[in-house]
Amino acid sequence: MEQTYEYAWIIPFIPLPVPMLIGAGLFLFPTATKSFRRMWAFQSVLLLSIVMVFSIYLSIQQINSSSFYQYVWSWIINNDFSLDFGYLIDPLTSIMSILITTVGIMVLIYSDNYMAHDQGYLRFFAYMSFFSTSMLGLVTSSNLIQIYIFWELVGLCSYLLIGFWFTRPVAANACQKAFVTNRVGDFGLLLGILGFYWITGSFEFRDLFEIFNNLIYNNEVDFLFVTLCAVLLFAGAVAKSAQFPLHVWLPDAMEGPTPISALIHAATMVAAGIFLVARLLPLFRVIPYIMYLISVIGIITVLLGATLALAQKDIKRGLAYSTMSQLGYMMLALGMGSYRSALFHLITHAYSKALLFLGSGSIIHSMETIVGYSPAKSQNMGLMGGLRKHVPISKITFLLGTLSLCGIPPLACFWSKDEILNDSWLYSPIFAIIAWATAGLTAFYMFRIYLLTFEGHLNAHFPNYGGKQKTPFYSISLWGKNGVKKNSCLLTMNNNESTYFFAKTKYPIDKNGRKMTRPFMTIAHFEHKAVYSYPYESDNTMLFPIFVLGLFTLFVGSIGIPFNQEGGNLDILSKWLAPSINLLHQKSNNSMDWNEFLKDAVLSVSIAYFGIFIASFLYKPIYSSLKNFELINSFVKKGPKRILWDKIINGIYDWSYNRAYIDAFYTRFLVGGIRGLAEFTHFFDRRVIDGMTNGVGVISFIVGEGIKYIGGGRISSYLFLYLAYVSIFLLVYYLLFSTL
C-alpha cells in the first residue's frame, strides 16, 4: 500500500498530455489534428478513466486502513525559508478525486456528440482535460501555496469555457463578469494565505493546524488579526462557490456550452470553494465567530438562491440558482461543524446536478432543431412543453434528478439533505426554519422546471408562447461564430405588461418566430438534409452518460446510510471519513435512532410534496383548462384581497426576475462609482496635473518670447542687458555686504 501512495503524485498529470498535444498539433499540423479529432476525445476519456481507477483503489485502501498519506519535497531557498511541494492523500482528497473523474468522464463522453458540429471541438476537449488536471492538482495539494496555484488554474479553465463562444458578446461579457467577481475572492484568499504564514511560519496544512492550535491554546495571537485573515481565506471560497454576495457571476456562466455547465456545477469550480472550507475546517473551528459567519453566509445563500430560481424562464439559469442554493446548504453544514453531512451532500448533489444539466443539454439539443441555434429560444421553457412524448428517456432521467433534488426517498439527495436539516435544529431554530422552508421552495421550483418543460403541449409550434415580449434573441451559429443580432439589457422588464408570477400569460413572438410553421435544420457538412417538425431524442452517446448518472442518483446515497443495527457497521462514508473526523476531534456516531429519523423524514418529505403539489396545481395543464370555469373564477374575482395577493405575487416575481436587484445595485453603485472615480481621476490628471506641467512650459515660453522681443533679436542688445544685470547684481551685493 505504501508503494501505491508513492505514485499518487502522478494523478494530476495523467490528463495533462491531451491539452499539450492538442495545442502542439493545432499549431504544427492543424489539418491532420482536426481530421483525427475523435481520437483526441478518446484519449481524454481514457486518461481520465485511468485516474478514476487509481482514485478508487486509493479510496478502498483508505477505507480499510483509515489512514492518510503525505509526501513533501523541500525546495530550500535559504536557512530561514523553504518552499515545500508535495501531495496529500486523505479521505477528502479521495472523495473529490472520484467525484471529479466520474463526472468528468460522463461529461467528456456526452460532449463528443453535443459538440460534434462545433468548430471548436478540439479546443473544447483541450480545455476540459486541463480543467480536470487543475482540479485534481487542487484536491491533492499539501499546502496553501499549491492550493492557490491550482485555484487560479481552475479559475482560468472556467473562464475559458464560460467564454468558449467568445465571438458572442454576451458570452464574452459573462466570462469577464466571472473573472472580475472571482478576482475579489482570489485577492482575499492570497492575503489570507500570507497572513496565516506570517502567524505560523508554515504553508503545510498539518504544520499549520498544529502550530496555530498551540498559539490559540497559549493565547499568543491577536484574535482580531486572525479573524481578519480567516475572513479573507473564506472570501475565496465565497466567490468560487457563488455564495452571497459574490454569486452574481454564476447565472451568466450559463453562456458556455451545456456540458461545461454540468462539470462546473457538479465537480469542479463551485465545488472548489466547499473543498477549501472543508480542508481548512480544523483552522476555522478554533477561531471565534468565523464558523458563525460561514453558517450565516450559507443560510442567506440557501434562501436567496431558492427565491431567485422561482421566476426563471431559462432552464439552465434555473438550475444554476438551484446549485447556488444547494451549495448554501453545504456551507451551512460546514459552518455548523457537520463535516460529514456537508461532504455527503456534496457527493449526492454532484451526481444529481450533473444528471439535470446533461438532461437539460439533451432537451436544448432537441429544441435547437425546432427554434434554431439561439440560447434565448432553445433554453426558454416558454417554448417547451409536452416534451415527454418526444424525449421519453430524457424525461425519465430528468424527473429522477428533480425528485432527488426535491429530497424524495430513496434518491440520493434525500439522505444528505435530511442530515443537514436535522443538524440545523440543534444549531439554531431560526436557521432551521429557513432551511426547512427552503426545502419546500426547492421542490416547488424544481417541479416548475419539470412541468414547464415536459408537460402540456409544445409551445414552439404556436404563434404565442409564455415568455417575455422583449426577450433578446441571441443567435449562435453551428460553429459558435455568429455574434449578437440584437442588443438588449438582460434584466429589462416592461412593467406595463400584466404579468403574474403563476400565470401562463401569452405574449406574441417576433415576426421570424411566427413564420416558423415547419422549422427544419440544414447542415451543409452533412450528406443529407434533415427536416424536423418535433424534437427528437438524443442518440446513445448522449443518453449513456445520462443513464449512468441516473444510476448514481439512485444508489450513491446508500454510502452514507448508517444501517448499523446490532453492532454491524455498514456506514461506508463515516468509515471513509474517520481520519478527517478524528482530526477535527469529533465523535463519529454512526448509530441512528430510526424512530427519530422516520419522524424527521416524514416532515421533510411532507414539505417537499407540498411544494410539488403547489407547483403541479399552478403549472400542470389541468389548471389551464379549469381556470376558465365559473367555479374557479369565483375564487379569483377582483377585490381588496385579490389585489393585495396580486401585488404580493408580482413583488415576488419582480424580486426573482430581477435577481433580487443585486446585479442592478452592483451596476449602479459599484460599477458606476468606479467609473465615476475613473472619470474624476482622468479629469484631475488632464486638467490639474497636466495643467501644472503645461502651465510651466507655457509660462517659460511666454517669458522667453518677451525677453526675445525686448532684446530685438540683436546680439549686442543681449550682451548689453546681460552686463547691465550683472552690474546691478554686483552693486546690490556690494551695498548689502558693505553695511555689515
UniProtKB/Swiss-Prot annotation:
GO molecular function, one term: quinone binding
Enzyme Commission code(s) on record: 7.1.1.-
Entry keywords, A to Z: Chloroplast, Membrane, NAD, NADP, Plastid, Plastoquinone, Quinone, Thylakoid, Translocase, Transmembrane, Transmembrane helix, Transport
GO biological process, one term: ATP synthesis coupled electron transport
Membrane topology: Multi-pass membrane protein
Keyword DNA repair: no
Plastid among keywords: yes
GO CC aspect terms: chloroplast thylakoid membrane
Location(s), subcellular: Plastid, Chloroplast thylakoid membrane
Transmembrane segment boundaries: 9-29, 40-60, 89-109, 125-145, 147-167, 185-205, 219-239, 258-278, 286-306, 327-347, 354-374, 396-416, 425-445, 543-563, 602-622, 717-737
Reactions catalysed, as given in the entry: a plastoquinone + NADH + (n+1) H(+)(in) = a plastoquinol + NAD(+) + n H(+)(out); a plastoquinone + NADPH + (n+1) H(+)(in) = a plastoquinol + NADP(+) + n H(+)(out)
NCBIfam families referenced in this protein's UniProt entry, alphabetically: NDH_I_L (TIGR01974), PRK06590.1 (NF005141)
Protein's job: NDH shuttles electrons from NAD(P)H:plastoquinone, via FMN and iron-sulfur (Fe-S) centers, to quinones in the photosynthetic chain and possibly in a chloroplast respiratory chain. The immediate electron acceptor for the enzyme in this species is believed to be plastoquinone. Couples the redox reaction to proton translocation, and thus conserves the redox energy in a proton gradient.
Family: Belongs to the complex I subunit 5 family.
Protein name as catalogued: NAD(P)H-quinone oxidoreductase subunit 5, chloroplastic
Gene: ndhF
